[in-house]
């Protein structure tokens, strides 16, 4: 009442404002703040069946599998669904996208960039120090410094002890 006791949300917001985000930008090449939240670009137009699938997914507590034919926009449906989830629950979300081949990691990454979703490309041949990045982002997520993390990985890398142990630490 006298201003000395602050709610968790107020303290968290003040703390996040005080961070030198340029450090993260220098280390990771990006940082996340409110102005850089993921969004659906105006250039993306979803079809009625995609919107219906997203609504059904939301009604099912954001759980389910999209079973759609080739070329019907599964990736866009999935990414716009992620945006819906991030808007509904704006913190502590771990997004893991598993694909069968490394070139699909790259394709998903290119699509996620259009929606301003920051991600880690995690697979064995990636030259970037993605394992360190993943550990850092999980630490930040667990300590309320980061609202979400997104890992795109291959099925083979997903099955590794390294990734499984990190997922269990979230």
Question: Predicted segments — roles?
Answer:
Residues 1-31:
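Signature of lipid phosphatidyltransferase scaffolds
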Residues 31-170:
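SF2 helicase/translocase NTPase motor core
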